Amino acid sequence: MLFNFDLENIKVVLGLIAGIIAFLAYIIYVISILRGKTKPNRATWWIWAFMGLVVGLSYYASGAQNTIWVPFIEFIGPLSIALLSIKYGEGGLDNKTDLICLFGAILSVILWIIFDNPVIALVSSLVVDSFAIVPTIKKSYLRPEGEDFWAWFGTGIADSLNMFAVEKFIFAILVYPIYMLVSDLIIIFVLLLRKKGIMKDISFLGKHD
């Protein structure tokens, strides 16, 4: 047969599709930023860019293959948005939450160096990443108009598919896609809760200037 669609091949394809959807979600987010509808938090996205590199490398070193595309995009995407946040974003290292994020990022690198273990590095990186998401969750609740729902919805789909692309059901491989999916669902839920009229916008996705 020309194509051998066994379970492993399907997982490879799902991982690739998840990466493509994640990439498209970031494109939506970038467009929203350039149109002035979304104002990314500088602290969050710079830390995410840095942690995206750390997580991607440690996740790959932990044995991930099929699911590596999303972590790769989770470095490229946040780096692009972090650069845009210099001009179009808001916030910075001007409050306790942001300072905790910075301290956590530094601590993660130190732990990686001390233990020289990719799994420990991965877990510590995800803990730091969870600190970095706090400013965005807070902003999503206080000012939901400052976040793009459909971009987050797209990343939620990507991370859901990535769950099915997992090649080995072991902690080192499962922890990243589970963490990412939970993070996406929290922000999606907050945005749905705060954006009362979000369902009315479905028919007008391309209508905004």
Identify the meaning behind each predicted range.
Residues 2-209:
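Alpha-helical membrane-protein topology signature
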